[in-house]
Amino acid sequence: MRGQVFTLQGQTYFTFGGASSHDIQDGILDPAAYAFGTQDPDFKVKRKYLDSMNAMYRIKGVSWWERELPNEQEMAEGLENLKKCGNKVDYIISHSPCTSDMFLMGGRGLYQPDIISNYLEEVRATTEYKKWYFGHMHLNKQVSMQDICLYEQILLVPGKDYIYQFPEMEDR
């Protein structure tokens, strides 16, 4: 479902998920053994050791997934969907930032440009938008007038003439 354009409350949104794991320098644990689908008998020992070393690792299927990055088809579909709406949306929502925002934020030595940030840079260069929200950097920071990194912050995105009304309760 990466690269889709949605209209919600009269506003258009381009969405594109995915990111490179930046905190896997010490490896990826696989709780399942490769042979016969049994559990890895040393999984708990390995995890305890990595935790004791304050290691940066992930667990396959729990905190890391093989498809964390988009494939060529998903990226092409995203660009095609933007083209269908004249390369103009109200909001962009992604997990990763585009490369230029990554540089503006400094990256803290953990984040490096990659296939997805470069793709999103292409989206930025070819798309007109009001605001872009992303969260991969785990910060609450306004990077530019249009681009905002969200982590623990929640924002209300105003819709056109949107007033939420609760359904009336029936007296019983």
Predicted features along the sequence, with ranges:
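Short His-Asn-centered micro-motif
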Residues: 2, 16, 94-95, 134-136
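A short C-terminal boundary segment appended to hydrolase-like catalytic domains
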Residues: 74, 171-172
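Conserved beta-sheet core of the metallophosphoesterase superfamily
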Residues: 97-171
